[in-house]
Regions:
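C-terminal cap/substrate-recognition subdomain and adjoining C-terminal extension
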Residues: 96-102, 106-110, 117-298
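Mixed-charge, polar/low-complexity N-terminal
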Residues: 15-17, 60, 72-74, 164, ...
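A generic signature of intrinsically disordered, low-complexity regions enriched in glycine/proline
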Residues: 4, 9-11, 17, 34-36, ...
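Intrinsic-disorder-associated interaction segments
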Residues: 4, 8, 60-63, 77, ...
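Non-catalytic pre-domain segments flanking phosphatase-related domains
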Residues: 1-31, 42, 50-51, 55, ...
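Alpha-helical substrate-recognition element adjacent to the catalytic core
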Residues: 20-147
Length: 298
């Protein structure tokens, strides 16, 4: 084994030790129809038998306000918080989504959720699935149980006081603004992060327009955000890679992470090899010793 080969293997070991702890990738997941396979709001309403009431009220108010109203309806009809939790715990999810999340976290990626669902639904589901500790941040509408045991859902952005100013997004949440805040926080900390965004709905289109050229947008194929991006793909600066189900999500996500790690590894090895070559000092050859004949003794 040559010295240069040993140096390279040493550098690779150092690299992988660092990458196992942390890398420069942040993965932002939508929740409904991305992490889980259905819309959590519709799932709860349908499973508890309030679909007709929901459909009657739908044209009369914003979705977020409607869900708060539906939680009141459930409470008024004697539905308990435990019944809501039981419904949420049996929500369908593709079997490869959880392994994808665990693998991404193990590889050092930072994971976040940006969703128009609510904290109660999301936290109940991810705690049941055993993945709550993998997410560093959840951006969603606040949901809490009041003293009467009724689930109350509030808007992420209180549109009754002011507008968030984005015409593309629902009044209670602009996911694009959330992405800009995340980007700004990394810039302030001096972190050069690459973002991978996964989503399915129309509300995921605005954040796709905020991504940079080094980022990745993963829209679910044949879902609203994919349709919107397909209308004018040039508007999205990020690399777009669509997916169809949890298996495809895992494969594409792991592929991107591996690609990014390979690029970072090559950069690091190239940089370190350069330092090694510059740091080597060649000592000048010493002149050969001159043999002096010993004097004869008298």
């Amino acid at each position: 084994i040559t010295t240069s080969h040993r140096n390279r293997k040493t550098l690779e070991n150092i690299f992988f030790q660092k990458m196992a702890k942390n890398n420069n990738i942040v993965i932002v997941f939508d929740f409904d129809k991305t992490i889980i396979d259905v819309d959590s709001d519709n799932w709860v309403v349908d499973e508890l038998g309030f679909t007709d009431s929901f459909n009657q009220l739908l044209p009369t108010m914003p979705w977020n306000s409607l869900m708060d109203r539906m939680m009141k309806e459930l409470h008024d009809h004697g539905k308990t918080i435990e019944e809501i939790k039981q419904v949420l715990r049996r929500i369908p999810i593709h079997p490869r989504v959880i392994p994808a999340i665990k693998s991404a976290h193990a590889l050092g990626c930072e994971l976040r959720i940006v969703s128009d669902a609510n904290t109660f639904f999301i936290e109940t589901i991810i705690e049941h699935l055993g993945i709550s500790d993998f997410f560093s941040e959840i951006n969603t509408n606040p949901g809490f149980v009041d003293e009467q045991g009724r689930l109350t859902i509030s808007p992420y952005h209180d549109f009754t006081k002011s507008s968030h100013g984005c015409s593309r997004c629902p009044p209670n949440m602009c996911k694009g603004l959330i992405i800009e805040r995340i980007q700004a926080s990394f810039a302030k900390e001096g972190k050069k992060m690459k973002m991978i965004y996964l989503g399915d709905g129309a509300g995921d289109y605005c954040p796709s327009l905020k991504l940079k050229a080094q980022d990745y947008m993963l829209p679910r194929k044949n879902f609203p955000v994919w349709d919107l991006i397909s209308q004018n793909p040039m508007l999205v600066k990020a690399s777009v890679r669509d997916w169809t189900d949890g298996e495809a999500m895992e494969r594409i996500l792991m592929g991107i992470i591996n690609e990014e790690e390979d690029q970072e590894k090559e950069k690091m090895l190239s940089s370190e090899n350069c330092k090694l070559s510059v740091g080597i000092v060649h000592e000048p050859l010493l002149p050969l010793a001159i043999q002096v004949p010993l004097a004869k003794s008298c």
